[in-house]
Swiss-Prot record:
Record's keyword annotation contains Ribonucleoprotein: yes
Gene that this polypeptide is encoded by: rpsF
Organism field: Chlorobium phaeobacteroides (strain BS1)
Organism domain of life: Bacteria
Record's protein name: Small ribosomal subunit protein bS6
A biological process term (GO) from this entry: translation
Record's function text: Binds together with bS18 to 16S ribosomal RNA.
Keyword vocabulary terms for this entry: Ribonucleoprotein, Ribosomal protein, RNA-binding, rRNA-binding
Length: 134
């Protein structure tokens, strides 16, 4: 039995799919990780975003980040399953080493949470409308 290591997986799902299909694909991603010995610790579904460049003629993708513990021998099966899933445009699995985790904790400690650009533009519009009324 190998020691389970901490990994982070970023998945970009075809943003042109319906919400139900995206949710079903996320369930498939979770199931593939679990079937290959992975214990999911955290899932962050970012949502639909415009990609920097088209992938397979798709310009919008639904992003998700998954932290899981798993054996290194199971990664090949996970990658193969993701590669053959037509709804997954791109994926990346990274081993989270100790120095990287320490750096992440420091960043979280000293950083301020900033919303998405869409949230900021709505807040700016609200502030401008309040200022205009005064």
């Amino acid at each position: 039995m190998e020691i389970k290591k901490l990994y982070e997986c970023t998945v970009i799902i075809n943003g042109g799919l319906e919400d139900d299909a995206i949710a079903a694909t996320m369930d498939e991603v979770r199931n593939v990780i679990a079937k290959n010995g992975g214990d999911i610790e955290n899932v962050l579904e970012v949502g639909r975003r415009t990609m920097a460049y088209p992938i397979g003629k798709q310009t919008i993708g639904s992003y998700a980040h998954i932290e899981f513990r798993g054996e290194p021998s199971g990664l090949a099966a996970i990658e193969t399953a993701f590669r053959y899933n037509e709804n997954i445009l791109r994926f990346l699995i990274v081993h989270l080493s100790t120095p990287l985790l320490e750096m992440r904790k420091r960043v979280e400690k000293y950083s301020v949470v900033i919303g998405s650009p869409e949230d900021q533009s709505e807040e700016d519009q609200q502030e401008e409308s309040v200022a205009a009324k005064k």
